[in-house]
Amino acid sequence: MISALIIILALVLLLPFFVPFVERNLEIFLFIMGWAAAIAGGVLDKPLLRKALEDPVNITIAVFVAGLLFRWLERPLEKVISAINRGIPFPLLAALTVILLGLLSSVITAIIAALILVVIVSVLRLDRKSETQLVVYSCFSIGLGAALTPIGEPLSTLAISKLGEDFFYLLRLIGPEVISAVVIFGILAAIVIKPEQSAIGLKTAHTRESYVEIAGRTVKIYLFVMGLTLLGAGFEPLINRFLLDLSPFILYWINMISAVLDNATLAAAEISPKMADKTVQAILLGLLISGGMLVPGNIPNIISAGKLRITSREWARFGLPIGLAAMAVYFVVILFV
């Protein structure tokens, strides 16, 4: 059993990184791997199936409703952004963009927050360097903020489900760290980003989403979260054998691999209800912070980079230094607070 689970874990971690077809169809791949892990781990039964069917419901509804609202309100939103851009200085606009998207992402979902970010960047028409910086800071903020509620992103949905906790558990556990990080990223965006008016900006591939695309994304999110629920249950024997006794500080740095792998997938493989709150906190903060370093680490990164045509190298130039600095700062916080 353990050997089979190790093979499945290796496939889950490596194939999305090396096989483009798997990366493009990550939700379906993880759905299949979730079934494989549950069968290999000997945990597939009616209660687990019921849980796997129920867990994705809230985030799926949130994604669908938010997608419809975004489609209907996109044009007015563009006009509002243009008016705000004319009325306030750019540093203040940059800070507000990063902070508000980060805080709202836990309600409107990380996916919709990323789509709004694409609209904002498209309207502002800054130089390429400044736009890339704004996107990276914003995606760090969105990735962190969305984890505060179980409807914000798949990682938080899965964490609440596996731990059997209430809606506001993550807000209590990592809320102070996440909210302070979101505000700090906003302040840094205001200070660091210096737009050059004459330079060439990003070429956006932004187009209005169709109802079919909204429905398709909704189905994929449902399958994604269902697969992660099965995956997390299937990996319980591995967690019990190898991770439960590890120091939370070691787990924190191990989770830097979230920079190249989807953090919800890693959360499914690592989190256990048998862990202490301090260990869960270290795991989540490590995953959330490092998830912003590179494009594959988080859903908002993938959406923004794809629609705005930001290359992996451009993202890494800004994302890696920001992420490493944030990891160091919050390691000290975890160590001494």
Residue ranges of predicted features:
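Hydrophobic transmembrane alpha-helices of multi-pass solute/ion transporters
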Residues: 4-92, 199-219, 240-242
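Juxtamembrane helix-boundary/capping and inter-helix hinge elements in multi-pass membrane proteins
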Residues: 90, 122-132, 160-169, 248, ...
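Structural signature of hydrophobic alpha-helical transmembrane segments
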Residues: 1-9, 54-65, 105-114, 177-180, ...
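Membrane-interface helix termini and inter-helical loops of multi-pass transporters
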Residues: 43-54, 156-170, 236-245
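Alpha-helical transmembrane segments and, especially, the helix-loop junctions at the ends
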Residues: 109-114, 132-163, 186, 190, ...
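Transmembrane helical segments that form the transport core of multi-pass membrane transport proteins
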Residues: 203-285
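Hydrophobic transmembrane alpha-helices that form the pore/transport pathway of multi-pass ion
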Residues: 94-144, 269-282
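C-terminal transmembrane helix pair
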Residues: 170-188, 277-337
